[in-house]
Structure formats: C-alpha cells, structure tokens
C-alpha cells in the first residue's frame, strides 16, 4: 500500500503556523490571567519573527535557484510562500484585533494604561519632553535619502521612523528621511503620576523629531520594521577553523535579504511604496499594522506593571528533595536510577551533579555536551572549576545552535581558557544530544555516572520548559556513553551500542524496528499500542510507518506540541491514530516513546523529535527507562497529559485543532496537576507549608537568556 500520497501529508510550514495560532488562542483565552494573556500575544510575535527569518528565508532561497520539487504534501517552495503569506497576514490581523479589542481595554479596566501623546497630562508631557531633550535627542541620527545620500541600511528587527518633510517656505520640495529608534533605551517608558501608566519610546520621538530637522517641517511620521534572512550558512566542509567560520557568518548574517516589512497603518501609500522599493520587497511581504509594531514589547510592559499579582500565574515551588542536600549525588544514583521532571522537579540536582564532580577528589573525568546554556551558566563555572582542580574535562559546545552561536562561541573560548578540552561540533552535523558523563574511582573500580535528558543544560529555560532527565550508573549505558564521547572527540566508530541509540540513522532504525514489532503483534491478533510525545513530527518515512502500523491495527496516541505533518481520520490509513497538542503555561518539550511490546512495555526518552533533521543531520540520543518505578512514573506522566481536558487540542480530520469536549469529563489541566503534586511533595518533605526551594514565576515558550521575555521564542530546538 502507498502511504506517501500527497493527500496524506500536511505541509510543515503551514502546520507550524497552525501551532502559532494555538499560542494565539492562549492570548484570547479568558480563563488565563490577564497579564499572562498579554505575554502569550508577545510570544506569537517572536515566534512569527523567527519563522520568517529562518523558514521563509529558506524557501525564498529555493525559489531563487528555481527549485521546484514539491514537498510531501505536493507544494513547491513558491506554493508554500504564497500560502504562508495568506495565513500570516490573517494571523497579524488577529493579533492586533486581540490587542486592540480585548487586551488593552481589559488592562485599562485594571488601571494599566498604554498611553499616546494626546493622552498625557501636563506633568507627563513635560516629563517626556525633558526625556527627549536630555536622553534621546543626543542619540538620534537622521538619515536622508536623496541623489547624494542613498537609502541607508536598515538593520534586522530595528524600529525605525519614516519621515516626509519639506523645507520651510517650499511645500513642493518634499524629502524623505528615516530615524532609527535607539535600542539602548527601554521601549516601554514609565510615566510619572498614577502608577502603571506607560508610553512607547517611538511615540515620544515622533512627537519631537522635528527638532532634528532645522528649517524643515515634518509632514508625516510613521514607524516601520524589517525582518531579514538570518539563516546561518556555514560551509563546514570548506573551512579549517569552524569557530572562525561561524564568527564570519554571524557578521554576514546581519545583512541578509529582507523577508518582511511592517509599516504603521497611518503611513501614506506614497511612503509605503517608497520603502518597499528601497528594500526590494513585493506587496505580499508588506504588512500594514494596526497598532504598535513588534508586539514583543508586551513582555516588558508586563514586567513594568506594579502590583496586580492576581493577573499573573501564581508562583509555585519546584520539588528539591531534602535527601539531595543530605547525601552525595553519587550515592543516590548508585542506589537507584533517578527520573526528573522539570520544572516541577528542581533543576538544581543537575547543577549539583557537575558541582560535586568538580570538587570530588575521586572524580577523574567529566564529559558533557552543551547545546544552549544560559548567559550566566553555573554549569560552565563548575566545568571550569573541575579542569582547574586537575580533572580531565571534555565539553562539546555546539557553536551552530541557531541564534545562540555568539553565546556558545563565547563559552567555548571561556572553557578553553579555564583548561577544558573543547569540541566545537562535528562537520555536517549538529550535536543536539543532552549527555553528561562523570568517571569516578571507587573501591570496586572505575564507575561511570550519567545524566541524560530531553532538554538543554540551561538553568534558566529549565524553569519554563517541561523536560525529563535520567540519572543512572548503569554499566552498559556507561560504556555506551564513553563510546559516544570517543566518537564525538576522535575517530571512533563503535560497531554497536548496548542500550543507547544515537542518530544519525540509529534512532530512525530503532523506531522502525519497534513499530515493525508492534505491527507483527497486531497482525497476530494481540493488543498493540504505541504512545509518543514530541515537539514535532514531520519525517515522511516515520509518518508512513505510523500509517502502516495504524492500518495493521496498532493503536497510536501522539502528543505533539508543534508541527504535525501526519493527518488523522484517513479511512484505512490513520483511523487508529489520535493526535493531541498541549499549549499551556509551560512549554512542553520532553520526548517520550512507549511500545506495548506484547505485554512487556518498553519506554524511552530522547532528545530527538521525529523530524528529518533530528534523525539524519543531528547527533541525538535515545535512552531506555529500565527500572520499573522509573518507567511507571514516566507513563503516569504521559497518561496525565493524555487525559488533559483544559489545554489539549485534538487534531481533526479536516486538519484543524479542536479543544476537548469536556462534557461529562473530569476537568484536568495536566500542567496544573503536576504543579499541585510538586507543591504537595515540597510540603511533605519539609513537614510544613513553608517550602525551602526557590519559588518560580514561570514564563512559557521563551529562549535561554537570564532575562527571558517575549522577544525570545520557542526555537523548536533546531
């Protein structure tokens, strides 16, 4: 049977836009706290920005070389760009309808005001005038566009003001100028007087920008913003120094082609046409915005609000068992494997694992992969400390991790300075696996301790990405881990692995084998079940194998937060497949793979999604949960999420997503349930209601910075 028909597949890019619509739904959800709804709206903007600078940019490159091969859904690059444009324009309209018709009026009901210049009282007007004169004016640079001064370069994601001016006494002599809004100043300006009154910096500049043009009159002012191609193109095979090549490409990336132009609705048609021509874009790439450009400022607005704790998610305490503070982490791991579920379990034991290894005299070596780390990473600190304490420390820092290249280049150099052996990544592959190995001398001989995870070693994103990690001292897994690091650092090619599976190729082969096993079980008339949780499913071969399993009678449950190119409800093809997507307070990021295995279930965690890039072009890790209590907990986590009736959307046969019809069902928000369980564990551990672990105000779907906000995004772990 042919499982590759175009009608069986959804285009990857359009599926991603559907995901961002689900995030936008959270901004429109009246059951969410108001300030969290505002945050969600900012997140949709940052998500959309990266989508254009990477995915749309990639499609336009294909168009530029006349690449016409269709994707599995039958769409060429040109077809996709056209469909994206239609869907994205509609999304932008919905974003600003949500802002203007819902969120801003609701904020005003709570005495939180985003004001215009016309709204300011006398005191506030004097304040912004002084602010402009004393702070902003010296930093502003007017740029003319005429025969002797060509149109200036407009940087990616910078906010700019287009002006139409004429010389005093000569209204016919109209000229164009542009002024960049300096990003060294806060965009959200707190006004004096009543609390929670704000104005955007561009409104102040537009009001007083005329002082930059002496003997000229300003006829029109309007903001605009461009998004450029930021897709890094590193010629790895042709470079002898990967680090230098990445740094070179980072500089070149700043001048990528324009993918999208946003202009204020108030901008005249004449100005729009002039800008579009100067920037080299067509009408489909022009977005007319009914409100402030670049909604990522909303996270800054939320942070600036004083009081109103009731308009945020309530804080809670991650679980950090007392025994972790009382005993050596190595003794705990030696006793039994430890499964962690972040952020409900505190991430601190992972940091402690490296910290204790750095100080333990019996530790001989530490080996670790780093993909995205925070801007002030304690793990980096302790790895350097370990090297300075005479231990052999080897760290693979993936310098090609998208939009973290500069941060990772910085840390790679820092680790080298501290005495660590640093690997910058492998040619042609990104190392995306999350693996830490500690080699320790004990009375019984050399012992290996490991941490393997589904998410990054990032102490910041661990607060709002849901991930899982395993501590183990399993001997076979330890041998496998050593072989993986030997492969990453040298020329080793292990003939096989005992219990771990890696990509490229290995994870694909393993998943196919397990699905074939379930197909055989179903054909033998026995119950066969597959359960998977991942961020995205787009690989055509894996999807076709899932269709084959469904056709054979295997019951398949998929929890997929983001991209899903598989279609449900196709008669005889996907009748036995159900797909859920959970979008909530925290970003679902863990990967779980369950196979019923003829009554002896097998459960695995992984760093890999079922995407072609993860299976073919990444070094990924898939590892088993072997101890019964550990595997049972993992499946309880999956089942709780599957039973979610609050934040789940179910993929429909028409390719839309619908919320669960909760009539007659228990109301269950899986993330809220995990939070409740964590709080109960904290209280039970301390014997009172005063937790000792740090409380967290979690922010969903943002990237690894020490000050996460909606200018960052869910990067789909490229």
UniProtKB/Swiss-Prot annotation:
Molecular function GO labels: ATP binding; metal ion binding; polyphosphate kinase activity
Top class in the EC scheme: transferase
Residues that coordinate or bind Mg(2+): 372, 402
Pfam families: PP_kinase, PP_kinase_C, PP_kinase_C_1, PP_kinase_N
Coiled-coil residues: none
Active-site residues, record numbering mapped to chain: 432
Reported cofactor(s): Mg(2+)
Summary of the function given for this chain in its UniProt record: Catalyzes the reversible transfer of the terminal phosphate of ATP to form a long-chain polyphosphate (polyP).
Protein name per UniProt: Polyphosphate kinase
Organism, scientific name: Lactiplantibacillus plantarum (strain ATCC BAA-793 / NCIMB 8826 / WCFS1) (Lactobacillus plantarum)
Source taxonomy: Bacteria, Bacillati, Bacillota, Bacilli, Lactobacillales
């Amino acid at each position: 049977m042919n499982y590759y028909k175009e009608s069986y597949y959804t285009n990857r890019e359009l599926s991603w836009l559907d995901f961002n619509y689900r995030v936008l739904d959270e901004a429109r959800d009246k059951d969410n706290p108001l300030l969290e709804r505002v945050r969600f709206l900012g997140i949709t903007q940052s998500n959309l920005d990266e989508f254009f600078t990477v995915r749309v940019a990639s499609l336009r490159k294909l168009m530029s070389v006349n690449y016409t091969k269709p994707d599995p859904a039958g769409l060429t690059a040109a077809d996709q760009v056209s469909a994206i444009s239609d869907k994205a324009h509609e999304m932008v309209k919905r974003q600003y309808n949500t802002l203007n018709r819902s969120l801003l009026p609701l904020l005003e009901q709570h005495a939180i005001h985003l004001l215009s210049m016309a709204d300011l009282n006398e005191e506030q007007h004097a304040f912004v005038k002084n602010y402009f004169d004393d702070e902003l004016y010296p930093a502003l640079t007017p740029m003319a566009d005429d025969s002797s001064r060509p149109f200036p370069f407009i940087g990616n994601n910078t906010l700019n003001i287009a002006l139409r001016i004429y010389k005093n006494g000569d209204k016919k002599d109209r000229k164009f100028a542009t002024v960049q809004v300096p990003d060294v100043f806060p965009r959200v300006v707190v006004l004096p007087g009543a609390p929670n009154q704000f104005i955007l910096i561009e409104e102040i500049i537009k009001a007083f920008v005329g002082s930059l043009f002496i003997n000229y009159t300003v006829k029109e002012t309007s903001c605009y913003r461009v998004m450029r191609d930021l897709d890094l193109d590193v010629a790895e095979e042709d470079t002898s120094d990967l680090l230098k090549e990445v740094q070179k490409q980072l500089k070149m990336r700043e001048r990528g082609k324009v993918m999208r132009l946003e202009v204020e609705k108030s901008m005249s048609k004449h100005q729009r046409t002039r800008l579009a021509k100067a920037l080299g874009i067509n009408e489909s790439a022009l977005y007319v915005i009914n409100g402030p450009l670049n909604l990522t400022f909303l996270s800054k607005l939320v942070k600036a609000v004083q009081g109103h704790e009731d308009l945020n998610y309530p804080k809670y305490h991650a679980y950090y068992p007392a025994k972790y503070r009382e005993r050596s982490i190595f003794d705990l791991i030696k006793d039994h494997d430890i499964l962690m579920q972040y952020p409900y379990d505190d991430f601190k034991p992972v940091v402690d694992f490296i910290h204790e290894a750095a100080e333990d005299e019996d530790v001989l070596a530490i080996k670790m992969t780093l993909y995205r780390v925070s801007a002030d990473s304690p793990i980096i600190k302790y790895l350097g400390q370990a090297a300075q304490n005479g231990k052999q420390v080897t760290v693979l820092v993936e310098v090609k991790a998208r939009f973290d290249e500069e941060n990772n280049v910085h840390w790679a150099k820092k680790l080298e300075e501290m005495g660590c052996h640093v690997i910058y990544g492998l040619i042609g592959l990104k190392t995306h696996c999350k693996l830490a190995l500690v080699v320790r001398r004990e009375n019984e001989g050399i012992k290996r301790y490991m941490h393997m995870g589904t998410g990054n070693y990032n102490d910041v994103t661990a607060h709002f990405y849901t991930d899982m990690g395993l501590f183990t001292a399993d001997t076979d897994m330890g041998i496998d881990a050593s072989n993986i690091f030997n492969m990453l650092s040298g020329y080793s090619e292990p003939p096989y692995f005992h219990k771990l599976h890696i990509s490229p190729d290995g994870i694909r082969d393993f998943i196919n084998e397990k699905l074939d096993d379930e197909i055989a079980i179903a054909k033998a008339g026995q119950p066969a079940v597959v359960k998977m949780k991942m961020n995205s499913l787009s690989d055509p071969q894996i999807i076709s194998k899932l269709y084959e399993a469904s056709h054979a009678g295997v019951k398949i449950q998929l929890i997929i937060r983001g991209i899903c190119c598989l279609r449900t409800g196709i008669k005889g093809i996907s009748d036995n497949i159900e797909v859920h997507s959970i979008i909530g307070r925290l970003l679902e990021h863990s990967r779980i793979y369950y196979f019923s295995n003829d009554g002896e279930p097998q459960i695995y965690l992984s760093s890999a999604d079922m995407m072609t890039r993860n299976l073919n072009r990444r070094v990924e890790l898939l590892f088993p949960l072997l101890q019964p209590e550990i595997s049972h907990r993992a499946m309880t986590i999956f089942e709780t999420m599957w039973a979610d009736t609050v934040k789940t959307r179910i993929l429909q046969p028409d390719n839309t997503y619908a919320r669960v019809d909760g009539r007659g069902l228990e109301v269950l928000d899986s993330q809220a349930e995990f939070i409740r369980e964590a709080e109960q564990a904290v209280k039970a551990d301390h014997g009172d209601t005063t937790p000792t672990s740090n409380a967290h105000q979690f922010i969903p779907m943002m990237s690894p910075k020490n000050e996460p906000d909606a200018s960052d995004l869910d990067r789909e772990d490229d």
